Amino acid sequence: MGRLIFLSFGWLVVFLSLSGTGADFQCPSEWSAYGQHCYRAFSDLKTWEDAEKFCTEQEKAGHLVSIQSIQEANFVAQLVSGFISGSPKIYIWIGLRDRRKEQQCSSEWNDGSKVIYVNWREGESQMCQALTKWTEFHQWLNTDCAGHYPFICKSRV
């Protein structure tokens, strides 16, 4: 009996190790996986509102990217830096905008997740937020929501 339990446990360990770490999912073609999400940068130039709408209409019905940690910020920066060329002043929309209610900034990303990690450039914290090439896509800068820029969508697996 003890040997059967030992063998069963051994097979369970082998099965779990072969099945991976929980990232055994397929993102749609041209999307990149990180954690439990799929990401894709789009070169289409859209306003913040139009970019958010576009992201919600994708196959996985996502949102403009929310960034919850320095590790995720580094992943997004790497994804974007391989995608964008040209002017160092290019902006990339992310899913955060100033929704002021009595002079208080929103504490939620547009996907409803809490803002637990921030990386605003000094003096920046209003309007719509974007990454910019001159900070190597790491810091968040505010810009007019009516501007037309590329963007990154993020969707749950």
From Swiss-Prot:
Gene3D superfamilies: Mannose-Binding Protein A, subunit A. One of its GO terms (molecular function) is toxin activity. Residues 34-154 form the C-type lectin domain. Expressed by the venom gland. SUPFAM superfamilies: C-type lectin-like. Keywords: Disulfide bond, Hemostasis impairing toxin, Secreted, Signal, Toxin. Residues 1-23 form the signal peptide. It is found in: Secreted. GO terms for cellular component: extracellular region. InterPro entries: C-type_lectin-like (IPR001304), C-type_lectin-like/link_sf (IPR016186), C-type_lectin/snaclec_domain (IPR050111), CTDL_fold (IPR016187). Interferes with one step of hemostasis (modulation of platelet aggregation, or coagulation cascade, for example). Heterodimer; disulfide-linked. This is Snaclec 3.
